């Protein structure tokens, strides 16, 4: 489909030796009724459709901007059918929710915060290359569709993912390239009037193989300086993407519509509240503890409402209450920010770089595999670790990327953590995002599957919240994992950094805060979370309320966060300086390897062998395709026993004559019992030997003495050339195994019976026809005598028993339907066999039939000669 209404632009991303990537924006073809619709392509191989639509009227009683971002993952985009019961897409995956968050965070600050019309951005993933991620492409598509929609949006926003591979920052890296990435960073920003790029969002983390790449291959560590360099490296790519979107706006943008904006309060109301409450609020905002401070602020707010109830009588009461609340909150914000900018004074009296009181404790919950409590000020995080077999790792039905996850981090924040009530249940987007960030911080220091073959689930319970629960989760997870015996390569700690900016004496300044409170997060301009070891950064996240933040300000915040991180790591090391002994309630997992060609023997037909081992030992067994075997049990003894059995199967010991075994009867027959000696090796205990268990008495059946599952002590009597094992009861090794007095191994073979010993089986006379002198193939054919000179194929064909004229074609014989008698229409039809079988006679004629005819089953049955030979001449 082509036409003048279709507009398209391209942005070329040059990665040097890693090649080029092309991002193309197209509008006018799809979703024409949406306010803005853009299809974004990455190398014409991945495709995301972005639509932006605004409600026609403002939402009533909303005191915030109602922006929603949804990502629709279509499994057909990857050539898959959904694995759910209904075989269709359902609730969004965690990957889709995380993509929603990285789109929402840079877009929201670029709308007027007083807009009350609902705005919805929908990203539909239509096609995706398995080597690419769609999230950053969707971010650029969302910015483009919003830019041309006619909404009051001060974009565009450009987004790029960079990976540090072999010392080079690569944009839009493929999954195969990301395997060698030391660090990955997603940066979104906008181009300001000066031409520089202001950063609006960061989502970053060290690669899963970063530790090995750094310490084994000598790759560059992603410390504060390197990460700051990554922010600078992202700017040219962001500028190229923003330029392409601006060109699309020039070609296809709608005119900006007029929307009603709803000021949160009037200036007169704000000034009056400032007169009444400024001094009291200034004092209340110096109370260090959260709950007493909130109680005091609530008292002041109520006094303000009482004072203003007789004033501003021309306002609606509901509107007046809303505006008083908004103006009162803005006054608090201005007081807190002004003190920080002019006095370096924070709410709880700390300096800009000070950290709240820290405490750490392990083993706080009984019976769990690992637990810890980390506290920073009034923020409390309870970390719980659970270990299990690798088969319990999470299976991910994703469009691209990894399909399994060995380390699963879940973050939960119940409403009581802030002293409130609310819904408890399935996780919200914020909880999923915080869990993913904490998971990203821990993954680079986890031991490998070979070093620690466990699936690990980490749960962070935010039981008390007053700022930075996500970074508190990182600290609690480190403590809990070490307490569970997980050999982390290094401890990890996290800290949340804040920012306050403003004009002081005609100069715009930035103040960076270490370890922000919840109120400082709400009243500040930035929430900058940084996690890492003592040597490098493992995770990073930036949210901001500003249009963008200069990169040098963020670089300074990274260095300030490093100082705080080292302080927290000292507290962690004082609590636990290495992995503890594993809990007695945790499963013990050991590994062994078997040759690939022996995997089938270990598993057995339909899993019989492996199930039997698990049943006998109580251990759980998982086998990888490469022959690695993971064995788990609550106690180490069961796992060791299962390992011994598996090793015997993989490297079997062939029983030798004279060896004694304690075996198990696995099968009984009329001539004896098969006894399992070692896994996969059975021997035959002859019935003549089984009599010895019955004091030599004759037995009618083997089952009278031995049954399947019985244990019996046996000795190997002999092993023949075919590997068949003969068994005996200890003390009766020399007893013959048959009634004829000969040893079973000495009995003649079937081939040798009734023939002289020097004659081979193949030398015995063949069964021939009566004519011994005639060649075998010249024997007369069965049933018919043919002339010897007549070809076999000339014999008469088998015909019907009817006689046909020779000159009549065979197919001209009368059909069965033609041989039927012609009946008058009034004549009743004969039922099948009605003259012999009364079951087919109509009910009304049945009595008459019984009187006049003989019932079939009363007749004598016809006898058949059993000695009749149809071929006997």
UniProtKB/Swiss-Prot annotation:
Question: Where in this chain does the record put each KH domain?
Answer: 587-646
**Pfam families documented for this protein:** KH_1, PNPase, RNase_PH, S1
**Ranges of residues in domain S1 motif:** 658-730
Enzyme Commission number: 2.7.7.8
Task: Tell me the domain of life.
Answer: Bacteria
Which Gene Ontology BP annotations are present? mRNA catabolic process; RNA processing
Query: What GO MF terms are annotated?
Result: 3'-5'-RNA exonuclease activity; magnesium ion binding; polyribonucleotide nucleotidyltransferase activity; RNA binding
Residue positions annotated to bind Mg(2+) are 521, 527
Q: What does this protein do?
A: Involved in mRNA degradation. Catalyzes the phosphorolysis of single-stranded polyribonucleotides processively in the 3'- to 5'-direction.
NCBIfam families to which the protein is assigned, alphabetical? polynuc_phos, pppGpp_PNP, PRK11824.1
Would you tell me the protein name for this molecule?
Polyribonucleotide nucleotidyltransferase
What species does this protein belong to? Bifidobacterium animalis subsp. lactis (strain AD011)
């Amino acid at each position: 489909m082509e036409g003048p209404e279709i507009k398209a632009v391209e942005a070329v991303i040059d990665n040097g030796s890693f090649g080029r990537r092309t991002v193309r924006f197209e509008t006018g073809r799809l979703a024409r009724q949406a306010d803005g619709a853009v299809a974004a392509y990455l190398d014409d191989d991945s495709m995301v459709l972005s639509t932006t639509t605004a409600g026609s009227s403002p939402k009533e009683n909303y005191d915030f901007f109602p922006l929603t971002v949804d990502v629709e993952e279509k499994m057909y985009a990857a050539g898959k059918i959904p694995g759910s019961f209904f075989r269709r897409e359902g609730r969004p995956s965690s990957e889709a929710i995380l993509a929603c968050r990285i789109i929402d965070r840079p877009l929201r600050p670029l709308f007027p915060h007083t807009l009350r019309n609902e705005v919805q951005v929908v990203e539909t993933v239509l096609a995706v290359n398995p080597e690419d991620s769609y999230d950053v492409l969707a971010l650029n598509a969302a910015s483009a569709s919003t830019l041309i929609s006619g909404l009051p949006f001060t974009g565009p926003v450009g987004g790029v993912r960079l990976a540090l591979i072999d010392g080079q920052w690569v944009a839009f890296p493929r999954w195969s390239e990301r395997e060698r990435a030391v660090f990955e960073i997603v940066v979104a920003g906008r181009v300001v009037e000066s031409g520089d790029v202001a950063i609006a969002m960061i989502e970053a983390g060290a690669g899963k193989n970063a530790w090995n790449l750094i310490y084994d291959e000598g790759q560059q560590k992603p410390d504060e300086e390197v990460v700051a360099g990554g922010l600078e490296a992202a700017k040219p790519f962001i500028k190229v993407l923003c330029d392409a979107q601006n060109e699309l706006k020039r070609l296809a943008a709608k005119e900006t519509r007029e929307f009603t904006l709803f000021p949160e309060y009037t200036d007169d109301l704000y000034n009056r509240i400032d007169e009444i409450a400024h001094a009291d609020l200034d004092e209340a905002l110096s109370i260090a503890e959260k709950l007493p401070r909130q109680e005091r602020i609530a008292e002041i707010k109520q006094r303000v409402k009482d004072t203003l109830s007789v004033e501003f009588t021309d306002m609606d009461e509901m509107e007046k209450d809303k505006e008083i609340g908004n103006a009162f909150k803005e006054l608090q914000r201005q007081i807190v920010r002004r003190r920080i900018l002019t006095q370096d004074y924070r709410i709880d009296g700390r300096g800009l770089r000070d950290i709240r009181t820290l405490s750490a404790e392990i083993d706080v919950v009984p019976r769990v595999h690992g637990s810890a409590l980390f506290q920073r000020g009034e923020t409390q995080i309870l970390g719980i670790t659970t270990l299990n077999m690798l088969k319990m790792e999470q299976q991910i039905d994703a469009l691209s990327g990894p399909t399994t996850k060995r380390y699963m981090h879940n973050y939960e924040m119940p409403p009581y953590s802030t002293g409130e009530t609310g819904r408890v249940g399935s996780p919200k987007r914020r909880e999923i995002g915080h869990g993913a960030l904490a998971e990203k911080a821990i993954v680079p220091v986890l031991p490998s599957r070979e070093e620690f073959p466990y699936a690990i689930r980490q749960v962070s319970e935010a039981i008390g919240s007053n700022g930075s629960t996500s970074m508190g989760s990182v600290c609690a997870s480190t403590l809990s994992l070490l307490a569970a015996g997980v050999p982390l390569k290094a401890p990890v700690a996290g800290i949340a950094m804040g920012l306050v900016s403003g004009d002081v004496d005609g100069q715009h300044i930035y103040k960076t805060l270490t370890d922000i409170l919840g109120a400082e997060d709400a009243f500040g301009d930035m929430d900058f979370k940084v996690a890492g070891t003592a040597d490098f950064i493992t995770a990073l996240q930036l949210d901001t309320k500003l249009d963008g933040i200069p990169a040098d300000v963020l670089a300074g915040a990274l260095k300030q966060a490093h100082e705080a991180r080292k302080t927290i790591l000292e507290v962690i090391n004082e609590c636990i300086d290495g992995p503890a002994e594993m809990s007695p309630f945790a499963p013990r997992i050991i590994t062994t390897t078997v040759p690939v060609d022996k995997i089938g023997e270990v598993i057995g037909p339909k899993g019989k062998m492996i199930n039997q081992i698990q049943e006998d030992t109580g251990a759980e067994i998982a086998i990888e395709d490469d022959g690695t075997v993971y064995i788990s049990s609550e106690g180490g003894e069961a796992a060791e026993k299962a390992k011994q059995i598996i090793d015997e199967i993989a490297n079997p010991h062939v029983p030798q004559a004279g060896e004694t075994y304690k075996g198990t009867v696995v099968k009984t027959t009329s001539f004896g019992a098969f006894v399992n000696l070692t896994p996969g090796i059975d021997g035959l205990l002859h019935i003549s030997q089984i009599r010895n268990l019955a004091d030599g008495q004759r037995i009618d059946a083997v089952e009278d003495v031995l049954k399947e599952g019985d244990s019996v002590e046996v000795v190997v009597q002999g092993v023949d050339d075919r590997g068949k094992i003969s068994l005996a009861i200890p003390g009766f090794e020399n007893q013959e195994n048959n009634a004829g007095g000969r040893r079973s191994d000495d009995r003649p073979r079937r081939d040798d019976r009734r023939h002289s010993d020097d004659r081979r089986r193949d030398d015995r006379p063949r069964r021939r026809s009566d004519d011994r002198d005639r060649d075998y193939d010249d024997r007369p054919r069965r049933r018919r005598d043919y002339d010897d000179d007549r070809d076999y194929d000339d014999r008469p064909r088998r015909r019907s028993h009817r006689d046909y004229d020779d000159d009549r074609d065979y197919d001209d014989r009368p059909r069965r339907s033609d041989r039927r008698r012609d009946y008058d229409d009034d004549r009743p039809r004969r039922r099948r066999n009605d003259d012999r079988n009364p079951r087919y006679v109509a009910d009304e004629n049945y009595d008459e039939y019984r009187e006049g005819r003989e019932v079939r089953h009363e007749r004598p049955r016809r006898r058949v000669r059993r000695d009749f030979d149809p071929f006997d001449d």
